[in-house]
Amino acid sequence: MGVIQTLDSLMTNPMPEGRVEDILRPEGENPLLEKGYVTTSVDALLNWARTGSMWPMTFGLACCAVEMMHAGASRLDLDRYGVVFRPSPRQSDVMIVAGTLVNKMAPALRKVYDQMPDPKWVISMGSCANGGGYYHYSYSVVRGCDRIVPVDIYVPGCPPTAEALVYGILQLQKKIWRTQTIAR
């Protein structure tokens, strides 16, 4: 019985702590069902729409890319979170940098980042992307992709599990929800 409980805890998908406020709340008071309309701010509406439709572009450079592909497979099913991988930077709003970034690839990373439409976010996945990792002291390795592009979420590990990436994506959704889109 203890083994089954352990397996059940491994098979569950991670959820970020704290409540993510949603316009349509299934429990408690629901203003749409009670009054027939919802009042909200433009910021809240835009952020609500963005958290449900994140389109990441993969920038897989090493072994972390295999775990990124695993996260997109059927077991974890990122589609249910509104995450659909896109092949082009012009169609995506999230970049996942996974793996060792070398000096020769740094200009290409920046060029692809600049081609993404605003607003854009970056997830740094793995020890190599976060700070150079195992190859930190190599002459050709960039010691963290945050030296090239601004990073919003860091996913630690060597390589991080697919569940860790899903947790990082959920944390990014919470961060998007809290940002103010339109300056007052």
Curated annotation (Swiss-Prot):
What's the top EC group for this one? Answer: translocase
| Domain of life, source organism | Bacteria
Q: Which UniProt keywords apply?
A: 4Fe-4S, Cell inner membrane, Cell membrane, Iron, Iron-sulfur, Membrane, Metal-binding, NAD, Quinone, Translocase, Transport, Ubiquinone
Molecular-function annotations in GO: 4 iron, 4 sulfur cluster binding; iron ion binding; NADH dehydrogenase (ubiquinone) activity; NADH:ubiquinone reductase (non-electrogenic) activity; quinone binding
Note describing how the cofactor binds: Binds 1 [4Fe-4S] cluster.
Establish whether keyword Nucleotide-binding is in the entry: no
Catalysed reaction(s) here are: a quinone + NADH + 5 H(+)(in) = a quinol + NAD(+) + 4 H(+)(out)
Q: Where does [4Fe-4S] cluster bind?
A: C63, C64, C128, C158
Assigned EC number: 7.1.1.-
Topology in the lipid bilayer is annotated as:
Peripheral membrane protein
Kindly list the biological process annotations in GO that this record carries: aerobic respiration; electron transport coupled proton transport
Necessary cofactors:
[4Fe-4S] cluster
Please give the GO cellular component terms listed in this UniProt entry.
plasma membrane; respiratory chain complex I
PROSITE patterns attached to this UniProt entry: COMPLEX1_20K (PS01150)
Task: Give the location in the cell.
Answer: Cell inner membrane
Q: What is its main location?
A: membrane
Annotated InterPro entries: NADH_UbQ_OxRdtase-like_20kDa, NADH_UQ_OxRdtase_20Kd_su
The Swiss-Prot or TrEMBL record describes its family as follows: Belongs to the complex I 20 kDa subunit family.
Q: What does this protein do?
A: NDH-1 shuttles electrons from NADH, via FMN and iron-sulfur (Fe-S) centers, to quinones in the respiratory chain. The immediate electron acceptor for the enzyme in this species is believed to be ubiquinone. Couples the redox reaction to proton translocation (for every two electrons transferred, four hydrogen ions are translocated across the cytoplasmic membrane), and thus conserves the redox energy in a proton gradient.
Fill in the subunit field for this protein: NDH-1 is composed of 14 different subunits. Subunits NuoB, C, D, E, F, and G constitute the peripheral sector of the complex.
UniProt cross-references to PANTHER family, sorted A to Z = NADH DEHYDROGENASE, NADH DEHYDROGENASE [UBIQUINONE] IRON-SULFUR PROTEIN 7, MITOCHONDRIAL
Identify this protein by name: NADH-quinone oxidoreductase subunit B
